[in-house]
Amino acid sequence: MMEESGIETTPPGTPPPHSAGLAAVPSTEAHLAVTSSFSSPNTSGMETVPPHSHSTPQPSLPPVQPSAPPPFVPLSPAPSTPLSGTSVPPSVSPSPATAFSGPPLSHFPPATSASGALLSAPPSGPPISGFSVGTTYDITRGHAGRAPQTPLMPSFSAPPVTGILPAPITQQASMTSLAQGPGTTSAITFPEEQEDPRISRGQDDAPAGGIWGFIKGVAGNPMVKSVLDKTKHSVESMITTLDPGMAPYIKSGGELDIVVTSNKEVKVAAVRDAFQEVFGLAVVVGEAGQSNIAPQPVGYAAGLKGAQERIDSLRRSGTIHEKQTAVSVENFIAELLPDKWFDIGCLVVEDPVHGIRLEAFTQATPVPLEFVQQAQSLTPQDYNLRWSGLLVTVGEVLEKSLLNVTRTDWHLAFTGMSRRQMIYSAAKALAGMYKQRLPPRPL
C-alpha cells in the first residue's frame, strides 16, 4: 500500500546515520509544535510515533502542550543534493464533519528522511487540509472584500420576510475553537441577530389609542360616515314601515326639544316627522293650548293670531318654559278670489333663546262656497269673537252634509291628500328655515 501511494520507505534492516537521526529529532519537534497549533485540543495528550519505521525501537517524544508553542528552532541546512525518489505525501482535505467531530489522530504521516522533515515547514497561507483559526491569521485575506466561505459560517441569502412574524430566537452555537489556548480569542466575528423593524413595529409600536383610535379614525372618515348614515336610514325606514309606531322611539333624542301647541295627533305627528327628518333626532311633544279666538278663523291675520296665541297661553300658564322652543298650527279660511274660498294652515316656530320666529303656510285647499255660507249662517250676529271668525267650523258643516267625511280630515275627501300630509310638508319647510337660522354647532 505504501508503494502504491508513492511513498518510498527505508528498508527495516538499514538503520539511519546518527547525524541524520539527531537532526530529525528537533525538526520533528518543530513540525509537531507547528502542527499542534492547528490541531484539535483532543490531540494534546496523544503519543507520537517516530517518523522512521525501522527495527530499532525509538523513545517516544514527550506530550505536546498546546498552551504555549515552543520557540522556533533553526533547522540545519538541507543537503545540497536532494534525495532522489523522495516524495511528499499529498495532503488530503478532510470534510468539515471530519475536521471538527472526528476522533483524535493516532499518528502522523511518517517522514521518509531528514529531507522530508525539512520540507514540512508551516505553510505561508491558510491550511487546506481543514479549517482552523489562529490569532494572527486574517480570514478575509484573499477574498477581495467578500464574505469568507468557511465551514463555520456558510453564506446564504434569506428570503424576504413578509407579514408579521414572531421575534427570532437567537441560537448560540457552542463550538470549541481549534487550538485555542487559555486567554486566546478567536478572530472570527459572528454576525449579530438584528430584529426586523417591521416586526417590532407591528408588535411594540402600535398606534396611540389602540383599537379605539382606529375606530375613531374610521368613524371620522366622510365616506364611511356617509355609508353609515345611509345604512342607518335604510334600517330605520324598514323598521318604521313594518311598525310605524316605532318611529317616535327611534328618532327621539338629541339636543332639539320642541313643544307643539296641540294634543291632536294629526298636528303633533306631522310636526314630529318633519323636524326629525330635517334634524335627525328631535324630541317633539304636544301640549294643548288655547287660541282665544273664534273656532273657525277667517283671514291670514286671524290665522296667525290664533297660532301665536296658543304659544303665549302655554307660556302664561307655565306649562312650558319661557325659553322653550314651540311650534303652533292653526287652520283658517280665506277668500283669495271673488267667491273662492280656501282652507289654509298657518305654522309658527318661536325660539326665544336664539331670537328666531318664522312662519309657514300649508297648501290651499278649495272649499265649496255653499259650505262656507252655511257656516256663516250658523254663527250669531252678536257673537263676541265675530271679528276673528265663525262660531261653526267648515269641517263640522261638511261632516253633517257629506257621508264618510270627518270634521278633522275632510281634506282627504276633497283632494286625495290628508291634512297630516299637508301639515308635514309645511312643517318640513319650516324646519329647514329654522335649521339655517341656528348658529353652527361646535365640533
UniProtKB/Swiss-Prot annotation:
Pfam family, one: NTPase_I-T
Keyword Cytoplasm set for record: yes
GO CC annotations, alphabetized: cytoplasm; Golgi apparatus
Segments for region (Disordered): 1-108, 139-206
Positions with biased composition (Pro residues): 59-80
SUPFAM superfamilies, per database record: ITPase-like
Location(s) in or outside the cell: Golgi apparatus; Cytoplasm
A GO term, aspect molecular function: protein kinase A regulatory subunit binding
Amino acid composition bias (Polar residues), ranges on this chain: 34-46, 169-188
InterPro entries according to UniProt: ITPase-like_fam, NTPase/PRRC1, PRRC1
Gene3D superfamilies xref list: 3.90.950.10
Family membership: Belongs to the PRRC1 family.
Assembly and binders: Interacts with PRKAR1A; resulting in PKA activation.
PANTHER family documented for this protein: PROTEIN PRRC1
Name this protein carries in UniProt: Protein PRRC1
Species of origin: Rattus norvegicus (Rat)
Lineage, highest ranks first: Eukaryota, Metazoa, Chordata, Craniata, Vertebrata
